[in-house]
């Protein structure tokens, strides 16, 4: 049993290493392995925009395998999916030097859910539609978006859609204090 267990650990590491470099965060200074998920992120935003602008679709379900989820997790900065390996031929990914594990990033039936809430009508102060708010669930657990994103209030997991479009863009800009809801705009 001991030798078989060691073999299983070695094979698990080999599969994780392959996925890490091909679909995960990979090595420092590159993003090709996960920017391939950008069209999926763009579709999340497009679906929200379509609904907010009068579309009748109330939910969008997308189904995919780990080969899609791993890059999407790295792109979103989900827990355990962001630590890159050094850009080196000698300092490579190992379990000892990196938290990334395929079984954690994409367990069986891994899922990402965005809930969107928006008040109908227009903000009387701006004359524009109220800003949609978004929260994310990762494997059924409500979590914050990546650290570059500013929630509507300290400790909240709700974000303005405009903030997410900025902070999840490739340059990770944030609206800063404008991402917060003010006391007189809590219904926005």
Where would I find each of the regions flagged by the language model?
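Non-catalytic terminal regions with compositionally biased, polar/charged low complexity
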Residues: 1-188
